[in-house]
């Protein structure tokens, strides 16, 4: 399991790069490649002038996550997405809703997406993602 850069096995350098790739995959997953408003999600329409980028400890993002997560905690996630960053209690309620309810609270929340992004970054950098995904 060596990269094209010569890192083999579980060396410190290999662990560093796989950690960085994991971070990149997480950021890509949470920002949706900067597509914060998906107009095809008509059940969770975007409010005019609102931005649905990553906020809070779980980095909730995109209108299709803010709507259900807001409903799960009794907040208008679509109409006031900034509240996640402005209100500490709602911030952590949102995180708990994701941790406890996952896919039930927020359809589309998928570890498979993050794994897919991780594999894409590994491929682009010539690094073996390893067998434990």
UniProtKB/Swiss-Prot annotation:
Catalytic activity: Random endo-hydrolysis of N-acetyl-beta-D-glucosaminide (1->4)-beta-linkages in chitin and chitodextrins
Keyword set includes Hydrolase: yes
Signal peptide: none
Keyword Hydrolase assigned: yes
GO biological process: cell wall macromolecule catabolic process; chitin catabolic process; polysaccharide catabolic process
One of the record's GO molecular function terms: endochitinase activity
Residue ranges of the TM segments: none
EC number: 3.2.1.14
Keywords: Alpha-amylase inhibitor, Carbohydrate metabolism, Chitin degradation, Chitin-binding, Glycosidase, Hydrolase, Polysaccharide degradation
Active-site positions on this chain: 30
Function: This protein functions both as an alpha-amylase inhibitor and as a chitinase.
PANTHER family listed in its UniProt record: CHITINASE FAMILY PROTEIN, CHITINASE-RELATED
Record family assignment: Belongs to the glycosyl hydrolase 19 family. Chitinase class I subfamily.
Protein name, entry field: Alpha-amylase inhibitor/endochitinase
Organism: Coix lacryma-jobi
């Amino acid at each position: 399991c060596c990269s094209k850069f010569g890192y083999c096995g579980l060396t410190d350098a290999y662990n560093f790069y796989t950690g960085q790739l994991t971070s990149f995959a997480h950021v890509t997953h949470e920002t949706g490649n900067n597509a914060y408003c998906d107009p095809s999600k008509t059940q969770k329409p975007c409010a005019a002038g609102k931005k649905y980028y990553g906020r809070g400890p779980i980095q909730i993002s995109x209108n299709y996550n803010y709507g259900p997560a807001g409903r799960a905690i009794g907040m208008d996630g679509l109409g006031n997405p900034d509240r996640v960053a402005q209100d500490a209690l709602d911030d952590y309620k949102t995180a708990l809703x994701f941790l406890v309810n996952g896919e039930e609270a927020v359809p589309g929340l998928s570890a498979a997406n993050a794994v897919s992004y991780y594999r894409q970054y590994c491929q682009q950098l010539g690094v073996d993602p390893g067998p434990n995904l």
